[in-house]
Amino acid sequence: MMSRQLVFIGAGMFTVSMAWMSATESTILSAIRTSPEARATYLAHAIIWRDPGALSPKDVLEGPVGAFPYTYEQANSDEGIECTFAQAGKELGGSSAKFLCRTADGHDLRLKYWDPQSRTGNREVFGTVAASRLMWALGFDAVPALPIKVRCDGCPENPHTGAGSRRTRRYVAMLQAQWPTPVILSNGRVDQGWSWRDLDTAIRLLPRGLERARQRTYFNALTLLGVFMQHGDRKREQQRLYCAAHVDTEAGELRADNVVTPPLILLERPGASACPTSAVTIVDVGATFGGAGRESSEATAKMNLEAWERKRVFTATNGNECRGELTVSFRALLDGESNPVISEEGRRFLVEQLHRVTQEEVRAIFRAAHVDQLGPRGPDGSPEAGRAIDTWVAVFQDKVRQIEARRCQPAE
C-alpha cells in the first residue's frame, strides 16, 4: 500500500527540516498536469483497494512502518515527545485547533491537539487515528496518522490562537503525514481532489466487463465503509488522485512551479500517459465516528460514541435497495452523495474485509486512538482505558452485524 512506502515532503501536515529534504526534493514531482478527459480516465482506473496482507494487533497499534520519525512506543511513552512552541494554529490555515512545535533535532511538527486536563481541544486527534488505522487494516488508502503525547515548552494557554501565559504544557496530539505525490490534476490547484460523484460517474462510464465490475465493488465497499464510520465531511479537497508508480517523465515537460513543494510538475502531453498506475486516497478522515451532519460539528460529528451509536448503517427502505444512512456536509453538497446506494457485491466485499480484522485488532485501533481520553474517569481522575475501549468495540461490532444481516440489490 501507499502507506507502507510513503515519502514525506516538506510542506503540509508534517514538515521536516530542509536538511532532511535536500537530498530528495529535486527529484520528487509534486503533480502531473493533464487534460480533464485524461484525468477522468486516470480516476476511472485508479486503485481503490489493495490487499493489506496479514496484520497482527501489534501491527495495527503501531501503524504503517516507517511512516514517521517516531515509533508508536516512542511517541506514546510517559515522557512523550518534547518540542518548543513555534507557531499558533490560526496562522497555519483552517479553523481546527492545532499548532506548530519544533523538536531539538529540527523537526517541525504540525499537531492537532487535545488537553487531557480540561478535556477540550480538537476531537480529530482521535477520529483521524481510528479511521486511518481502520482503512489501512481493511486495504483502503488513507493518509497515516500517529497518536503522540507532547510536552510543549513555551506553549501559550491557547496554542491555536497564541494567547495566554506560556509554560510547559502536555497534550495528547495527532501527527498526520503529507498526502502521497505526485497528485494528478487538470487545473492549477494542488487540492483539486475528487468528489464521490466524480469517481462514481467515472466507473459507470467504463465499458462493461471485469474491470468495471471490480471497480464498482471496491467503490461501493469504500462508500459503505464511509457510512460505517459516518464520514460525512466529503468535500472534494478531502480526497486526492495520485500516481502510485514510477512516472514516465518522457510523456511530458518538466516545469518549475513555485506554488507547490517540491517546486516541480510534469505537464503531460496530449495523448501521452505519464502514470502507469493511478490511485485514490482520502487525506482527511478526522470527522468520523460520530453522527456526521451538515455542519460537521466538533461536538457530534467527530469521535462521539453516543452520536455514532445512534446512527444505523442503512436507512429504512422498501425491497432490497440498500442506502447507507449518511448526511454529508454542506460543502460536499450533491457531490458527496448523501445516503448512498450500496450494491450487494460492495456489501459482501466489505463484510469479507471486516471479518479479517479480529476483535483484538479492533481494540488496537481504539487503543491507538486514545479513546480513553473521551471515556469515564476513575476515582483518581485518570481515564479508564479498558472500559472505554470495550464500549467502542461493542458499538463497532454491532455495526458489523447490521451489515452482515442486510441483503442488497446487485450492481447494474
Predicted segments with their positions:
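Sec-exported extracytoplasmic/periplasmic mature domains
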Residues: W136-F140, V227-Q230, R401
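C-terminal catalytic region of ATP-dependent kinase domains
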Residues: V247-T261, L267-E412
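Conserved ATP-binding subdomain of kinase catalytic cores across diverse folds
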Residues: A75-D191
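Cysteine-centric signal of extracytoplasmic or virion-exposed proteins
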Residues: C83, C101, C152-C155, C243, ...
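Conserved kinase catalytic-core segment
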Residues: R123-T128, Q192-M303
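Hydrophobic alpha-helical targeting segments used for export or membrane insertion
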Residues: F8, G12-M18
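Bacterial N-terminal signal peptides that target proteins for export
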Residues: M1-I9
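Regulatory N- and C-terminal appendages and interdomain linkers associated
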Residues: S3, V16-A86, T103, V371-E412
